[in-house]
């Protein structure tokens, strides 16, 4: 039996990680962002908001330094292929649970792609302007254009397979006008940390 969620509102800024497909580098990128923000001294909470139940994804955020982790399974969903209204109610419940962990910042992953039937679009609508930084993990530069054009908000940064080479980064910029970064390369970590601090307005 699910315990009722506390009557709290989540006000912390959110880093939202979306992807063009199921295995596009979201969890690896999320782990890095959790680690960077934790090293800056912030209380980081990790969450997986949509997708299919693979708890190891979100548990790896704990290994990276998150003080707590949450998953849609915590509100009784084995996957988020669900009625959008029911999912919305449960997601709001999940956000109240996340708020109870008193995060300075939330690193949230929307599993699969927002165009797949996992309610990614509903999740983005519910989160609204709490999302201060949107990372799109893409398998290839052409996929960036498809997903980026499907939403009102443009990603702040592109990562994943599309950005693992200089040629890929340049092609992302040429096709979409977006900035891409190879997060596997350690020399990208400081620029990413600076970008996060700026967008999240964390002090």
Regions found by a protein language model. Give the residues of each.
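Charge-biased, low-complexity intrinsically disordered regions
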Residues: 6-10, 39-43, 184-186, 191-202
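Residues at the starts of beta-strands that form the adenosine-phosphate
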Residues: 43-45, 68, 104, 132-133
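P-loop NTPase switch/communication element
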Residues: 45, 54-81
